[in-house]
Curated annotation (Swiss-Prot):
Modification sites for Phosphotyrosine: 139
Description of what induces expression: Upon B-cell activation.
Organism of provenance: Homo sapiens
Keyword vocabulary terms for this entry: Cytoplasm, Membrane, Phosphoprotein, SH2 domain
Stated name of the protein: Dual adapter for phosphotyrosine and 3-phosphotyrosine and 3-phosphoinositide
Resulting phenotype, residue 173 to L: No interaction with 3-phosphoinositides
SUPFAM superfamilies assigned to the protein according to its UniProt record, in alphabetical order: PH domain-like, SH2 domain
Length: 280
């Protein structure tokens, strides 16, 4: 009996969560999967894929939501999207497909599946991101070492980092002077919301600094469906999504961004500079 059949037989008698979370021999096949990253966090997955991945890079990791549920993190053009993978105890569910074994699940990815979400963004899963990457063992020598502050304690040493929280997709935007509606490609990264003429445009039309935004909310004043607005001191931007689900996703992540910005401001963590630039 081959290794795959042996482990497949074990899969039918093991608790579903054990197959994915245990570190002993019962989860050998999963641990041998080079692009399974275990308990890698959502933030770390986004940082890895954005900094060192490319369009179509992906990795599998444990979900922090519930046992038996896992996340496939996928690098799109300027964002990272996350999709659920579920092990039911008898099969693996991903997207519209269900796989009776881990072998079939992995084989599906070997054939570079095409997937799309509510935003309409299509992605080909081409590049599994490895858990282990070779790096040179080179270290720098410390030549200068002094303290820039005095009298501080461990209570003053608070680790901080901005969330990446990326999203991208087409939205229809109302013009500022001429109130016509045009479809633009939007990208959200850190505290910047950029919009471009289309997905292939190298330079944004405008960068909106979300630290200046006071509110994000559904809007019913424009006689359009799936519309929401971003309120800035200098202007209110009206945007429309193709579906209600997509509009809700944008509102949720933008509101979450604003809550994180306010939290940082209230805690006095760093200086956030204003960067609302108009290029054309």
């Amino acid at each position: 009996m081959g290794r795959a059949e042996l482990l497949e037989g074990k899969m039918s008698t093991q608790d579903p969560s054990d197959l994915w979370s245990r570190s002993d021999g019962e989860a050998e096949l999963l641990q041998d999967l080079g692009w399974y990253h275990g308990n890698l966090t959502r933030h770390a997955a986004e940082a890895l894929l954005l900094s060192n991945g490319c369009d179509g890079s992906y990795l599998l990791r444990d979900s922090n939501e519930t046992t038996g549920l896992y996340s496939l993190s996928v690098r799109a053009k300027d964002s990272v999207k996350h999709f659920h993978v579920e092990y039911t105890g008898y099969s693996f569910k991903f997207g519209f497909n269900e796989f009776s074994s881990l072998k079939d699940f992995v084989k599906h990815f070997a054939n570079q599946p095409l997937i799309g979400s509510e935003t309409g963004t299509l992605m080909v899963l081409k590049h599994p991101y490895p858990r282990k990457v070779e790096e040179p063992s080179i270290y720098e020598s410390v030549r200068v070492h002094t303290a820039m502050q005095t009298g501080r304690t461990e209570d003053d040493l608070v680790p901080t980092a901005p969330s990446l929280g990326t999203k991208e997709g087409y939205l229809t935007k109302q013009g500022g002077l001429v109130k016509t509606w045009k479809t633009r490609w939007f990208t959200l990264h850190r505290n910047e919301l950029k919009y471009f003429k289309d997905q292939m445009s190298p330079e944004p039309i405008r960068i909106l600094d979300l630290t200046e935004c006071s509110a994000v909310q559904f809007d019913y004043s424009q006689e359009r469906v799936n519309c929401f607005c971003l309120v800035f001191p200098f202007r209110t931007f009206y945007l429309c999504a193709k579906t209600g689900v997509e509009a809700d996703e944008w509102i949720k992540i933008l509101r979450w961004k604003l809550s994180q910005i306010r939290k940082q401001l209230n805690q006095g963590e760093g200086t956030i500079r204003s960067r609302s630039f108009i290029f054309k």
